[in-house]
Amino acid sequence: MSGYFITFEGGEGVGKTTQISLLAQYLRNQGYDVLTTREPGGTVGAEAIRHILLSGQAQNYGPLIEVILLTAARIDHITEVIAPSLQKGKIVLCDRFIDSTRVYQGLNNTVGSSVLSVLEYVALNGIMPCLTFLLDIPARCGMERANLRRKKAETIDYFEKDELKIQEQRRQAFLQLAKQEPHRFRVIDATGAMEVIAQQIKNICHQVILDQVP
């Protein structure tokens, strides 16, 4: 595939959506064909599954069904959106991907790592991010940001309700993934100003990909 696949990961309130928007605008100004998308979601079917997951409805059926729903959404997303876009040479920016599943569902040992690995293999079909930005902030800071966003939107999703201890465990799990795959991950301190973070991401893109993508 001639395109380039970039994912953004991190806990709640780290600013992924904002940074994706800023990077997409910058890359388009540089003349690149850019697609922004998200998980779960990205297609009509996957967005319907997203609603089920984030509303907490899937919790009624247990963690295995939750993971199966995520896998179904990812298969549809990759097949209908990500793979075709990469084949067309686009830069794909995705808000969450496989690493979020590894962290959010992986910390729930009731499913089992072997089941997660099999479902991951089936869903990905050989497609993995070329570059992953991990936006990292202390869990307490992330929750404070998420609370502010929630007040503005007057909504709260299932995963944002988790307590501070769990959020910090997820943060550490993301950092561990970054240590295991240093060639793919770039950890960004997301406690600073939005513009400073955006510039760091732009600099990394120049170093890593912009000379490679036609």
From Swiss-Prot:
Catalytic activity, reaction form: dTMP + ATP = dTDP + ADP
Which Gene3D superfamilies does this UniProt record tie to the protein?
Answer: P-loop containing nucleotide triphosphate hydrolases
Keywords on record: ATP-binding, Kinase, Nucleotide biosynthesis, Nucleotide-binding, Transferase
Please, one GO biological process term? dUDP biosynthetic process
Gene Ontology molecular function, alphabetical? ATP binding; dTMP kinase activity
The residues listed in the UniProt record as binding ATP, with positions renumbered to this chain, are G10, G11, E12, G13, V14, G15, K16, T17
Q: Where along the sequence do coiled-coil regions lie?
A: none
Q: Name one GO cellular component term.
A: cytosol
Q: Does the keyword Hydrolase apply?
A: no
- The protein's superkingdom reads Bacteria
Functionally, this protein is described as follows: Phosphorylation of dTMP to form dTDP in both de novo and salvage pathways of dTTP synthesis.
Q: Which PANTHER family match?
A: THYMIDYLATE KINASE, UMP-CMP KINASE 2, MITOCHONDRIAL
Q: Which HAMAP family match?
A: Thymidylate_kinase
Task: Kindly provide the name given to this protein in its UniProt entry.
Answer: Thymidylate kinase
Please give the organism: Bartonella quintana (strain Toulouse) (Rochalimaea quintana)
Q: Report the gene name.
A: tmk
